[in-house]
Amino acid sequence: PWRLGADFFFRNLLDGDPASNTLGWRWVGGLHTRGKPYHAQAWNIAKFTNNRFNPGSADLAEVVEGLEGEEPDGLPGVSPPRMPDNPDPRRPTVLLVTEEDCRPEDFDLSRLNLAGCATLTASHLRSPLAVSPLVEEFEREALKDAALRSNLDTTELRAGVPADLARWASRAGATQIATPFIPTGPLRDWMLDAKPALDEAGIRVVEWRRDWDEAIWPLATAGFFK
């Protein structure tokens, strides 16, 4: 059942994040925070639903059991952070902007041989079910704002057939796609699906990561209660 809650939130949160959303709901079920599942409180539900829901004490379980039995082998080992790479300034390059990072101007674009730019809408990848129109509008407007700030002629792409990414880059005459770092999540999965066509076309994808992310992310090894 926690997956249904996670899916509902992810489809409706304007700033939905695959990591915090998934981990938050796993905390509710006591999966990442083993032995400490979320214990629903009537006052909390009433307060944060503005009394639209006001359960009595008899409506809620007095004893809460976690879902550890669903994953008896425990948590997987900690994986090392995926390392970013630097774009090759000699290669014709296209800039790809996604909802994962709408500030490409934080990186030094002037040293690149830019042949084009595109925004990529991907919020529809969050779920097999329909994503809220407000989420799609939020993403669309954020990407539009990022494109205006880039001062580049920008193509609007939608994450559909993964091979289309290679076709767009090839039409622009590029052999390199530069994009701010895309963490684990639906968009990362889509980019992996696009990789065979990109490899076949001789196009490399390079992801930037900010220096402070580089310094801080390896230290993020604890959970809610550690």
Model-derived segments and spans:
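Active-site-proximal binding-pocket segments
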Residues: P1-P81, D85-R91
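Trp/Phe/Arg-rich N-terminal binding region typifying the photolyase-homology
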Residues: F8-N12, L60-K226
